[in-house]
Amino acid sequence: MELMVKGADALTVSETTFGREFNEALVHQVVVAFAAGARQGTRAQKTRSEVSGGGAKPWRQKGTGRARAGTIRSPIWRTGGVTFAAKSQDHSQKVNKKMYRGAMKSILSELVRQERLIVVDNFSVEAPKTKELVAKLKELELTDALIVTSEVDENLFLAARNLYKVDARDVAGIDPVSLIAFDKVVMTAEAVKQVEEMLA
């Protein structure tokens, strides 16, 4: 199949990468796993065995008229431990390479179908100026876009950093979440070739 390239000849690409059927279940599973892997999972509360104090019995067992108590660390007490204390845990989920590649191909194919993937011959800015990038995006009639280049372009990265709905990445930096997070995805022809090789 062929992809239209702005300002250049059409680019021949693989049908399996850019023309496959959308697998919603697979994409959902991979995106959820990706989001789960981004969780820190560092929360920690103290159980009754971890709270400080509570060595001595607060008052004697009988004769005070108060309810019996053996420790000030009891979860019933204001300064006691937490009954079912939340502990740090690993939320990451396993995603096989085949599944990951399948989800990426599915997303790219859907972007092509919905005409949300824009392929350009070249995309760069002369200086790390946001104004320059805004002008370039205006030419393409874009306000919400992910820009993917074949290699890290520092000027482009710095220019995009201050824009709310614009991000610039190289091919190695894209993932399922970033591809679906933006309204449009702008890729250079060289980046398209690299993506195809990466997912082959």
UniProtKB/Swiss-Prot annotation:
The keyword Membrane does not apply. GO terms for biological process: translation. GO terms for cellular component: ribonucleoprotein complex; ribosome. Residues 42-65 are annotated as: Disordered. GO terms for molecular function: rRNA binding; structural constituent of ribosome. Keywords: Ribonucleoprotein, Ribosomal protein, RNA-binding, rRNA-binding. Belongs to the universal ribosomal protein uL4 family. HAMAP family: Ribosomal_uL4_B. One of the primary rRNA binding proteins, this protein initially binds near the 5'-end of the 23S rRNA. It is important during the early stages of 50S assembly. It makes multiple contacts with different domains of the 23S rRNA in the assembled 50S subunit and ribosome. Forms part of the polypeptide exit tunnel. Part of the 50S ribosomal subunit. This is Large ribosomal subunit protein uL4. It comes from Vibrio campbellii (strain ATCC BAA-1116). The gene is rplD.
